[in-house]
């Protein structure tokens, strides 16, 4: 080992991480040890501006004072109660989300976007099976979309590069072109139960859905 390698804390921790963590991503050789709002500091104390923001989940900043206080308060009361019971914070947040959004009257809490998509796929198929028939199970998504990396969400992700090593995927997904209502109509048949769409696609550029297309959809 070179002297510089020994002194570089980033490299030391990076090598340890490469040894013990699954290589699900190609990581850059920098290791962050603390963060505050938009700033990050690596193991050597170098300061960075965070332009990734946890892919959006840290949009109020790292170590936000209000978030820290809310977490401490809740941890001091109750952390988890399982799905066998309600807890008061869960119920209050669900009501607030319904009131603010004005969209729907039910909330489904999940840990990630891919879990939200899995839940949506299951709900759409169960509803269609109960209301119509078992044959109404197909879901239309859009080319260049990204919905997650679990098997159901990956099946809705219309990107061959991301799907090919995990074949066979979940059956019953068709892919249309964004902002092309005719391509959607051509995919709809008696087996279609739902359409899943990102109003703004973020993979391979920023692809924005036209307002008229969304209205027709």
Language model features with spans:
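Active-site-adjacent loop/helix segments that line or gate small-molecule/cofactor pockets in enzymes
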Residues: 2-36
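Glycine-rich loop-to-alpha-helix module at the N-terminal edge of alpha/beta enzyme cores
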Residues: 19, 47-134
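Active-site and channel-lining beta-strand-loop segments
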Residues: 29-52
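Short beta-strands and strand-loop turn motifs
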Residues: 49-52, 194-201
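PLP-dependent aspartate aminotransferase-fold enzymes
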Residues: 95-194
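Active-site core of PLP-dependent enzymes with the aminotransferase class I/II
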Residues: 200-217
């Amino acid at each position: 080992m070179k002297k510089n390698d020994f002194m570089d804390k980033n490299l030391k921790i990076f090598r340890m991480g490469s040894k013990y963590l699954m290589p699900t991503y190609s990581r850059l050789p920098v290791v962050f040890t603390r963060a505050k709002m938009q700033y990050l500091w690596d193991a050597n104390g170098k300061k960075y501006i965070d332009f990734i923001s946890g892919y959006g989940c840290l949009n109020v900043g790292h170590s936000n004072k209000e978030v820290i206080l809310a977490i401490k308060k809740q941890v001091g009361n109750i952390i988890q109660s399982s799905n066998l019971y309600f807890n008061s914070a869960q119920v209050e947040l669900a009501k607030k989300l319904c009131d603010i959004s004005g969209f729907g009257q039910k909330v489904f809490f999940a840990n990630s976007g891919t879990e939200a998509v899995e839940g949506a796929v299951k709900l759409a198929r169960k509803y269609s099976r109960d209301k119509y028939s078992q044959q109404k199970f197909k879901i239309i998504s859009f080319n260049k979309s990204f919905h997650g990396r679990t098997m159901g969400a990956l099946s809705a992700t219309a990107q061959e590069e991301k799907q090919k090593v995990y074949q066979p995927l979940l059956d019953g997904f068709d892919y249309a072109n964004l902002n092309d209502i005719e391509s959607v109509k051509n995919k709809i048949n008696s087996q279609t139960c739902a359409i899943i769409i990102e109003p703004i696609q973020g993979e391979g550029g920023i692809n924005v859905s036209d307002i008229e297309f969304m209205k027709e959809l």
